[in-house]
Regions:
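A membrane-interface helix-boundary motif in multi-pass transporters
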Residues: 165-178
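A late C-terminal transmembrane helix in Major Facilitator Superfamily
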Residues: 136-168
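Intracellular helix-loop hinge segments at the cytoplasmic ends of transmembrane helices
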Residues: 25, 130-136
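Small-residue-rich transmembrane alpha-helices and their cytosolic helix-loop interfaces
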Residues: 9, 59, 63, 90, ...
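C-terminal transmembrane helical hairpin of 12-TM major facilitator-type secondary transporters
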Residues: 15-18, 53-132
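Multi-pass alpha-helical transporter architecture, strongest
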Residues: 176-197
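Extracytoplasmic gate region of multi-pass secondary transporters
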Residues: 1-73, 160
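Signature of the 12-TM Major Facilitator Superfamily
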Residues: 3, 53, 57, 84-91, ...
């Protein structure tokens, strides 16, 4: 398979898994300003537990949308086309990552909604890729082509969390840049003549 299929898969997964790796700490940072109870603020143990609960809640709810996104985006791609849906996912994710990085979506509850959307795109990309491979290379080649895509997926599983951990302050901007690269490739992608097995 070509870079035009493996790179978009890589950037989508890098952004998604990178976010997942830092989702709880980010949510806890956004929840902290909402705590006004003196009993919590003056008790480090209770405060830690409350923040952990807030982080866990975002992780749990967004995980549900990760699963739902696999159904939702795959269904939309059947109607509007794989390329259009991938372009939509890349563009909207890039915008949201930038807004979060700029602090515009720093409210805990707004961030929860954003996280749910971002993880729905992560799951949606995973679910839509097999159909994308079949559409462009033919059903007889889906195993080989999707194997390359999954290799890219595995590499991204290492790359994304490492980038988010090492460049924490800039990680959201880096994710947005990666997604913009994916968007450009998606826009330039031209469907190949389908092969038969």
């Amino acid at each position: 398979t070509s870079w035009s299929t493996t790179v978009p898969a890589t950037v989508n997964v890098s952004a998604g898994l990178g976010l997942i790796s830092q989702l709880s700490p980010l949510a806890q940072d956004y929840y902290r300003p909402l705590i006004t109870d003196p009993n919590l603020l003056n008790n480090a143990e209770l405060l830690t537990k409350k923040l952990a609960w807030a982080g866990g809640l975002v992780v749990a709810i967004s995980a549900i949308f990760n699963g739902l996104g696999r159904l939702f985006w795959a269904r939309l791609s059947d109607t509007f086309g794989r390329k259009a849906i991938f372009g939509t996912m890349f563009a909207t994710q890039a915008v949201i990552y930038i807004l979060v990085a700029m602090g515009i979506l720093s409210n805990y509850w707004v961030f929860m909604v954003a996280a749910c959307y971002l993880l729905s795109c992560y799951g949606g990309g995973f679910a839509t890729m097999p159909a994308f491979a079949a559409d462009n290379f033919g059903p007889g080649y889906i195993g080989k082509v999707y194997g390359f895509m999954l290799t890219a997926w595995a590499c991204a599983g290492i790359l994304g969390p490492l980038v988010f951990a090492k460049f924490k302050a800039q990680s959201l901007y880096i994710a947005a840049i990666l997604l913009i690269i994916g968007l450009v490739i998606d826009l330039l992608f031209k469907r190949r003549e389908r092969k038969t097995a």
